[in-house]
Amino acid sequence: MTGGRFDFDDGGTYCGGWEEGKAHGHGICTGPKGQGEYSGSWSHGFEVVGVYTWPSGNTYQGYWAQGKRHGLGVETKGKWMYRGEWSHGFKGRYGVRQSLCTPARYEGTWSNGLQDGYGVETYGDGGTYQGQWAGGMRHGYGVRQSVPYGMATVIRSPLRTSLASLRSEQSNGSVLHEAAAAAADSPAGTRGGFVLNFHADTELGKKKGGLFRRGSLLGSMKLRKSESKSSISSKRSSVRSDAAMSRISSSDANSTISFGDVDCDFCPVEDHVDATTTETYMGEWKNDKRNGFGISERSNGMKYEGEWANNKRHGYGCTVFPDGSKEEGKYKNNILVRGIRKQLIPIRNTKTREKVDRAIEGAQRAAAMARTKVEIANSRTAHARAKADAADQAALAARQECDIARAVARELSPDFYQPGPDYIKQRCQEGGDIKENPEEKVLEKPPSPKESPHFYRKGTTPPRSPESSPKQSHSPQPSSPEPSKKQNPSPGARLSQDKQSLAEEQVTAFVNKPSMSKAPAKELGASVSKYSGRHHVPNPSNGELHSQYHGYYVKLNTPQHPPEDREDDRGVSQSSSALVPRPSPNKWGPPKSVTKPVAKESKTEPKAKKSELAIPKNPASNDTCPSLEKEANSGPNSIMIVLVMLLNIGLAILFVHFLT
């Protein structure tokens, strides 16, 4: 056998022994452009046993066959390590994949590099799943056991909770980015394995008062559903939306917001959950989620038996609460949409009861099947651990062959650069820096906007994007004054017309009634002083008029207009003033006092004068007080009319809903 160094056209190099033109014995081979390195034993051009090192520092130590990893071996990839069997370059049949930083691990069977068959997955928080797998996901029958609730709420990292099952084919050995992001964004990322949730009955009992309280007549009417075979969403009553139903329905008083493993959108606060409470799910799984029949039970007595869909109670089932009360019927996304004991007239309770009973029986069968699958999974796990121990021995043999190959390469070509040790050293240094200064690394991750334009927030402009900064930062500013300039002239013109008409009205009123007492002037002065800090009012009469019309005081410059236009302007002011809210009643003293001299002159007809206050006068008249009082009296009447209409509509809807 001869040996030496051979440089390939792609930049790779082989340094070691060869026979008949093929690598044979011990040697080192680097990949294209010197990237990657295999060091170990060879047989007629193929690797046999040795160590392969990637530029990132990831390594494989074990056996090979036909240029692929085959047999027993250990792969270190990122923060994960796989120990076990390999088949034609993929993980399988038995093996253990574990995290180097947390207790997260999978022990069981593999196929094509993914969990497949039976296995046990232990999560970073200590929770476990035991059962069947397919394509790297929980699929079949299995049991999910959570940790105590207090621990599940403390551990927040998605890597530690690992609610989605572990994956094996990643570029850097970490959890899939989308799965990690989903777990981080979801509330389930902080409460691994808990899918049942209920609120305290005391607080919700206080909120549910009145006609729609729990168990009342109208509350039962509100919960009745159409027994159609079509979708529930198409038959939902128009009285409420989905969100309203989730807040008002009777199921919300005891339970029903649920945590999915990955796809929850909100995080309701649980009440009165002991820190030692645990939860167990036994049943069917599909595509890594609870689907089919199953039983979820807490150690505090809460239990659900029935159908599931996407980690939520969906279908027929029965929920038992810690206080012993039950909730039976049909669920849709964790909400009871068709209850048995909540209906006003239980006409079709028999059919619903049969469906609930069948669902409970199916859930119990699925739980029993899951327990049998757990036994098989535990036996597969024991075998996988034995293969992992054997893989450790294979890795030790591979390291020994690697050392021999390096010695042979140094003898044949002393100037040959071996990149493998540098790759490993660089990775160890990076890992040591992270362990020594974890706080500094955390502080360096969110860089300032100058360093990272990716953290651009609305309203800030990174310095590295000068082209986009004028458009984003300055474009909203000039656009805001333009609408105000366009809108100001039209209301201003109307305002000036109303001011002029009202001012002329008041002037004519004072001219026609010279015998006015001095008391209104004092009241006007008091009302003016109240708003003197905001507006300067030179004429108290004008200020009083505009406080009645606008609710604030405006300085007026009343020009002279032809007398024939006064009636038209007065009509416009009266019609427009009806649309404006009325001020407090104490400001209407002056108009009332104006009518006193008239009452003294005509003492023989006091009742007739009083009746005139409720009758609208001719627009040509100068006194506007009765029309203003009519406007004040019309406000409560319109409110009462609207309330009566709403009450009639509500009763009609309830009656129709009861009939359906």
From Swiss-Prot:
GO cellular component: endoplasmic reticulum; endoplasmic reticulum membrane; junctional membrane complex; junctional sarcoplasmic reticulum membrane; nucleoplasm; plasma membrane; sarcoplasmic reticulum; Z disc
Location, primary (coarse class): membrane
Recorded topology in the membrane: Peripheral membrane protein; Single-pass type IV membrane protein
Matches recorded under Gene3D superfamilies: Histone H3 K4-specific methyltransferase SET7/9 N-terminal domain
Biased composition (Low complexity): 466-477
Pfam families registered for this protein in UniProt: MORN (PF02493)
Start and stop residues of the MORN repeats: 14-36, 38-59, 60-82, 106-128, 129-151, 281-303, 304-326
SMART domains: MORN (SM00698)
Protein's UniProt name: Junctophilin-1
Organism: Mus musculus
Gene name tied to this protein: Jph1
